[in-house]
Amino acid sequence: NNRLTVVIDNRLDYHTLPSGRIVNGNDLFVYDQLGKYAVSGDKDRFPKEKQIINHDFYNYTGIHRSVLIYSLPEKHIDDIVIRTVVNGDYHAVSAELKGDGTDAVYTVTDENDEIVSSGRTGGIYIKDPHLWQVGKSYLYTLTVRTATDCYREKFGIRKISFDDRSLYVNDEPVYLKGFGMHEDFPVIGKGNNSAVNIRDFELLKWINANCFRTSHYPYAEEIMDLADEYGMLVVDEVPAVGCNNWPDYTYGKDRLD
């Protein structure tokens, strides 16, 4: 239930931007300039621990991403998820389609816009593909076309593995060099800006970095796309910061020691 609501009457609750402040897990109320509002029901879905705001960065509020409004045909493609599998000289490309895709045609083109594979199922093969490398990317384009809709998505083909000695990309060891970054700029603050994004990646390239950490939240889709284009690895963080003093049993077996 990942939903946020933008309201105009100063009301704050668990679903608004900015969100209402949770004092503790038993608190069923949030506050705004007009008074106290009750929050209905499901208090158990919120953590009982108190959030300690000790950020070492300015935590902007509001909408940080570009907002797009677009129209769709009645029968349309909602989304596609691409997975690549290494299999000898061939690489299998599978696409999971969400939406109406009973008559879908799948086509993969290379960076020269030449067709390298096609089919009417979500599983197609590319022989001797160009691999996506760190610092030297190569992106194919998958086009999914139906009678009423068309969806295009760029993707790279690479194999990621690791052991107790190194991280490997396409079976080659990679030494990570980079930074923990933030999505802001002194002039405009937090809003997404394509020119600033490209400037940041050019600076990363200039200093010979090959990765960055998204401290402390997932970054905009536009930035992740640029990382693909620049051959940059990304350590993608979850949106959690300032959640201190959680006991060990909170994560149980999911913890990585």
Regions found by a protein language model. Give the residues of each.
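Active-site-adjacent "subsite" loops/lids of carbohydrate-active enzymes
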Residues: 177, 242-257
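Secreted/periplasmic carbohydrate-active enzymes, especially glycoside hydrolases
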Residues: 1-234, 257
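Solvent-exposed loop/turn segments at secondary-structure junctions
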Residues: 218-220, 240-243
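Conserved radical SAM core fold
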Residues: 182-187, 241-247
